Amino acid sequence: MRALPLLLLACADGAGKPSAADDSGEAPVWPPDPSTYDCSASTPPARWIDRPAGCATDPTCTETLVSGHRGAGGALGVIAPEDTVHSVYAAVAYGLDFVETDPRPTADGALVNLHDDTVDRTTSGTGDVATMTLTEVQSLQVDLVDFPGDWSCAYIPTLDEILLAARGRIDVLVDANKTDRVDLLVEAIVRTDMVEHALFDTSSVEKIDAALLIEPNLRTMIRVDSEAQLTEQLAHFASHPPVIVEINDNAPELAEVVRSLGHRPLMDVFLADASAGLTGDTTMYEAALSAGVMIPQTDRPDLLLPLVWGDDQPARRSD
């Protein structure tokens, strides 16, 4: 197994108290320079967004929060290589509230954070993750595309490494749809002391049931496609309600239904990301927020966050 980077080991929990100001008393410059979160950074960025850290996992929190897909962006992302430790740092530097993860098992039973079932798209290698050892997966060069900054240290991390990078800085959505090894997922969350800040996220009711048998205090996130499914799952989990309810982006009308039942809806906004990225038109973002989506999940936090913050933007623009 690849040794944890010294930066990661030294700085887990190093975020300090949330603050919207730097040492000079001024709000941080935004968007952040890549040197604050890439491989050249001497320390990971601290959580700076001026919001109570507990808001992310508090079902009664009414603020609009933003989740970074695969860290600071997936296939449409322009900030950092997806699903890497430094994509978590980038999400923190940008002021996101959550990062979404993609853990899947290797042949020797390690959980690596990789969206696809093969390494072909995002690395220099080829092959199915399930047939490769952790050492083989972590020896591959991550595809850096054209991300600005220094990514020479980027590699495919384990779930533990992602959780440690996030601890004290940002909350984590642990996607449980890519493996049946519920035990490994829960063990990683417990082992990294992230039970209060990692959400077990899946469309499988059975997996959530199994996870809660292992760790009854686990935070959860359900996924629903219809009002009937929403009603059924909320009844099933009445004794342990989900922290977040993810709705299908084909059914934004469910957002208000979720809210009317006292829950917070999360929805992917990838079509809006594509539209805003290509044309600069943010209409689709605005439509999602107007529909009642409280937690948009995005590949383009650089485009969505200013819209969510509006006149209350907690940072100084660098442009």
Question: What is the predicted role of each segment?
Answer:
Residues 1-6:
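Sec-dependent signal peptide recognition
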Residues 19-20:
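A structural motif detector for short, solvent-exposed N-terminal "entry" segments of globular domains
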